């Protein structure tokens, strides 16, 4: 499962930035090294052909039927067969799996295009296609010398798909061949175009996706196409199970230096521990960034192991693929050292602020969310007067020749971390050995800061009584110059400016989540437990972070403002859940594909939030009413204690513990309401 938590559709638009130009740093030459996938990156037609009429073949959940036309053998430049180029009339039938997954795929196809639902399958027609196979999957087609090969049409097909924002293919094909494993990738000229990937080796998934370029993009916008997944099928597991972990990221050390906007310099050391034998690392990485209608590439100056030896790599398409000098045995450790310049430091909208957000790829991370569980150490240099903030406890905060310098360290493993800097003033207080820091954007807001400090410590103490020890020794509440959302990186809360109004906890403020700023602040504090003490294994289980934080915040709001506020919140959840319940089950909410458009697809975003947050919280509230507060919150505390050190927590883990604690089988209930679309 790829680490793709809500790819911002705003990336489809180039947001003008305020004047902040500076000459970009001159990149140093990257260390020459053979690139994984290089033999498969420039394929050619061999000149051998076969009659395609009546041929059919199956890969994974897909069945291809070639009605008319020709197949032309595709090889590497040294003549190794890797697949075929098809010209003619073909059809694809794709089975999404169980009935709920099939419903979701049909919904996505109707919403996004590319295929139509027929008899429970997705079907599409295509006129040209390229099929690439590892040797383990390659059909026994018989090719023979033929007429003049369609070299130009093949080149045009390759070029058509060359700028798609999709994962690397050539490097994965080499990885599969090296492992003597299965791999298949197809590019289909359809309406709109399709990509089909079957990859049990590096990603344990099969994906059918649409690629298209939306209308209405600004003039001069980079020539690229964007993708949406019609269907994703896990391989070798069910979607209820955690994704396979090949190697786990266990330590991250970063040195961040702000440069002329939008550039900065980063030096990163990452330590991995092999869980299975591995010869390659496939990592998500922000290799390209859209800035003022330009596509700026991350400049990797050096990539070595811990001893400084250069490693072969392939960089691009949002990924870094690293070939290891020798296979890692289970339990073996490897350190990567990276030195790169990156255009991540944009002051979006002209704000006096830049951010390196969680799960954005600003440092390389494994594709599977549950493969990242790392400590974090950061040294950050921000240009004065900007103050920097980062996940972790403060080691030092100093000034050096025009820089404000921050060093932090976090020993508790986390799935991701953040760094940001801006024009902030701070105030803080320490209670029970926990320091809370409030960072006000722009002008100082002393009254709001004092109130937020008081609110934080009050909610924290309540949660410690309810859920157990607070996991952070420091917590920073950072004002974001916007409205309507909150986010909880490790040891931090990013919250928009209505939280810094002096009327906090008295005014009704419009909310993104469910019930205004009161509950939103409590929700974000609850993530210290639900998100970091226990964390969801994959997007199918994201409700463990979000809905559980919702139900905890409900109890906090009841204590702060009375039972009536809790009833209002429960009513909001129920109404939102009813609105979106039929869109998908909760476990498939992150599979709802938004339209490929130059504007925000708000309906899909609302459905996802109402399922993961509202319906999930509604289910937990229903359980609370049935079990009573004592037993319900005892189950939550037991859940936290039982799975604190496990990185692969799933919904079935919670159901099993709930059933044990209550001496009742809750599986049928969750089948209907969590894995199904019914409402309790």
Specify the residue positions occupied by each region the protein language model found:
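A surface-exposed beta-strand-loop module
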Residues: 37-38, 46-50, 54-56, 60-162, ...
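Extended, low-hydrophobicity, Ser/Thr/Pro/Gly-biased non-transmembrane segments
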Residues: 117-253, 337-424
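Acidic/His/Gly-enriched intrinsically disordered linker/tail segments
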Residues: 546, 550-626, 644, 673-677
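Amphipathic alpha-helical substructures
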Residues: 276-277, 445, 471, 565, ...
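Bacterial N-terminal signal peptides
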Residues: 6-16
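Zinc-dependent metallopeptidase catalytic helix centered on the HExxH motif
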Residues: 354, 371, 457, 462, ...
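Hydrophobic helix-coil surface modules that form long, contiguous segments used
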Residues: 227-266, 273-279, 367-522, 551, ...
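Boundary at the C-terminal end of the N-terminal hydrophobic targeting segment
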Residues: 17-21
């Amino acid at each position: 499962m790829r680490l793709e938590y809500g790819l911002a559709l705003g990336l489809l638009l180039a947001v003008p930035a305020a004047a902040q130009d500076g000459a970009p740093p001159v990149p140093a030459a990257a260390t020459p090294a053979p690139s994984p996938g290089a033999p498969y990156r420039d394929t050619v037609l061999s000149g051998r052909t076969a009659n395609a009429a009546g041929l059919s073949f199956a890969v994974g959940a897909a069945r291809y039927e070639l009605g008319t036309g020709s197949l032309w053998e595709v090889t590497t430049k040294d003549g190794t067969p890797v697949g075929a180029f098809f010209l003619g009339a073909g059809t694809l039938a794709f089975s999404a799996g169980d009935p709920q997954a099939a419903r979701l795929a049909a919904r996505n196809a109707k919403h996004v295009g590319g295929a139509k639902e027929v008899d429970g399958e997705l079907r599409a027609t295509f006129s040209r296609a390229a099929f690439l196979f590892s040797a383990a999957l390659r059909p026994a087609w018989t090719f023979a010398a033929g007429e003049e090969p369609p070299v130009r049409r093949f080149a045009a097909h390759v070029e058509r798909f060359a700028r798609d924002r999709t994962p690397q293919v050539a490097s994965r094909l080499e990885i599969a061949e090296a492992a003597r494993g299965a791999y298949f990738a197809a590019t289909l000229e359809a309406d709109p175009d399709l990509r089909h990937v079957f990859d049990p080796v590096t990603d344990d998934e099969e994906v059918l996706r649409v690629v298209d370029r939306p209308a209405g993009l600004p003039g001069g916008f980079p020539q690229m196409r964007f993708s949406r997944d019609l269907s994703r099928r896990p391989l070798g597991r069910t979607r209820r199970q955690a994704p396979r972990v090949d190697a786990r990221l266990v330590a991250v050390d970063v040195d961040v230096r702000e440069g002329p906007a939008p550039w900065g310099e980063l030096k990163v050391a990452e330590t991995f521990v092999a869980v299975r034998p591995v010869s390659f690392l496939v990592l998500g990485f922000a290799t390209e960034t859209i800035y003022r209608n330009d596509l700026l590439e991350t400049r990797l100056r050096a990539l070595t192991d811990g001893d400084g030896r250069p490693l072969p790599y392939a960089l691009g398409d949002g990924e870094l693929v690293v070939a290891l000098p020798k296979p890692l045995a289970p339990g073996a450790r490897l350190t990567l050292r990276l030195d790169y310049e990156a255009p991540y430091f944009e002051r979006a909208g002209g704000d006096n602020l830049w951010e390196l957000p969680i799960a954005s790829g600003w440092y390389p991370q494994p594709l599977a969310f549950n493969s990242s569980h790392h400590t974090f150490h950061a040294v950050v240099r921000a240009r004065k007067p900007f103050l920097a903030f980062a996940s972790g406890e403060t080691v030092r905060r100093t000034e050096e020749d025009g820089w404000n310098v921050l060093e932090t360290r976090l020993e508790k493993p986390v799935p991701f971390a953040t760094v940001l800097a801006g024009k902030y003033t701070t105030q803080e207080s320490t209670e029970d050995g926990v320091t809370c820091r409030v960072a006000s954007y722009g002008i100082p807001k002393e009254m709001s800061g004092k109130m937020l400090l008081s609110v934080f410590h009050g909610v924290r103490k309540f949660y410690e009584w309810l859920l157990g020890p607070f996991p952070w020794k420091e917590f920073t509440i950072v004002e974001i110059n916007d409205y309507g959302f909150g986010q909880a990186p490790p040891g931090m809360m990013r919250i928009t400016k209505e939280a810094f109004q002096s009327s906090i906890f008295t005014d009704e403020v419009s909310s993104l989540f469910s019930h205004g700023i009161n509950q939103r602040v409590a929700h974000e504090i609850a993530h210290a437990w639900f998100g970091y003490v226990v964390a969801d294994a994959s997007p199918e289980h994201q409700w463990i972070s979000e809905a559980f934080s919702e139900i905890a915040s409900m109890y906090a709001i009841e204590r702060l403002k009375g039972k009536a506020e809790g009833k209002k919140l429960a009513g909001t959840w129920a109404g939102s859940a009813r609105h979106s319940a039929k869109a998908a089950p909760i476990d498939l909410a992150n599979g709802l594909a938004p339209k490929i458009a130059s504007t925000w697809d708000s309906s899909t975003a609302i459905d996802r939030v109402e399922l993961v947050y509202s319906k999930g919280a509604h289910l937990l509230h229903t359980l609370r009413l049935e079990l009573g507060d004592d037993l319900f919150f005892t189950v939550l505390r037991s859940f936290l204690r039982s799975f604190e050190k496990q990185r692969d927590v799933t919904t079935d883990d919670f159901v099993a513990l709930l059933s044990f604690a209550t001496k009742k089988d809750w599986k049928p209930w969750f089948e209907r309401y969590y894995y199904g679309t019914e409402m309790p």
